[in-house]
């Protein structure tokens, strides 16, 4: 089944909003029990790969980082796939590098080699899945899941902003 341009545009917009909300947005929205926004208001580059597994305060922290970053870029790889898994993986690498650079420039999180590796791997997984079968149903599923997660997340951010202003 052919994917309509409107669905494709909607999916790209939702994926971009999702990636930015959970990367740059972490510096502005706290999620109790998962992360504190203040801890991400930092301008730091971490170039040592996989060191994050040694520096977390909770045992599940590195696993949350690993699987969260993989999951974040699977839809990006799926949507970006056209003809080549390798080209799509390179695109995902550049997209991740852009996000990490934005985090550094905006002092909105750690610019981390692990994130670059895990995001690119997530993009590779998404591209590989799309190379096997790309369907409108999968795109609608990505959109629905992203919206279901984004709405409460952004509502939490709006509540924190209102509390800050008051």
Regions found by a protein language model. Name each.
Residues 1-107, 128-166:
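Bulky hydrophobic segments
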């Amino acid at each position: 089944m052919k994917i309509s341009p409107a669905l494709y545009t909607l999916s790209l917009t939702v994926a971009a909003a999702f990636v930015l909300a959970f990367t740059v947005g972490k510096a502005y929205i706290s999620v109790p029990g998962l992360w504190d926004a203040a801890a991400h208001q930092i301008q730091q580059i971490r170039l040592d790969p996989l060191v994050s597994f040694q520096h977390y305060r909770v045992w599940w922290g590195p696993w949350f980082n690993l699987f969260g970053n993989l999951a974040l870029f699977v839809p990006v790889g799926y949507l970006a796939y056209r003809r080549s898994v390798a080209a799509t993986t390179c695109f995902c690498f550049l997209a991740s590098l852009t996000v990490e650079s934005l985090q550094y420039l905006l002092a909105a999180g750690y610019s981390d080699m692990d994130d670059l590796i895990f995001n690119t791997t997530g993009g590779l997984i998404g591209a590989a899945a799309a190379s096997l079968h790309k369907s409108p149903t999968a795109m609608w599923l990505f959109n629905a899941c992203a919206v279901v997660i984004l709405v409460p997340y952004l509502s939490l951010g709006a509540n924190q902003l209102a509390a800050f202003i008051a």
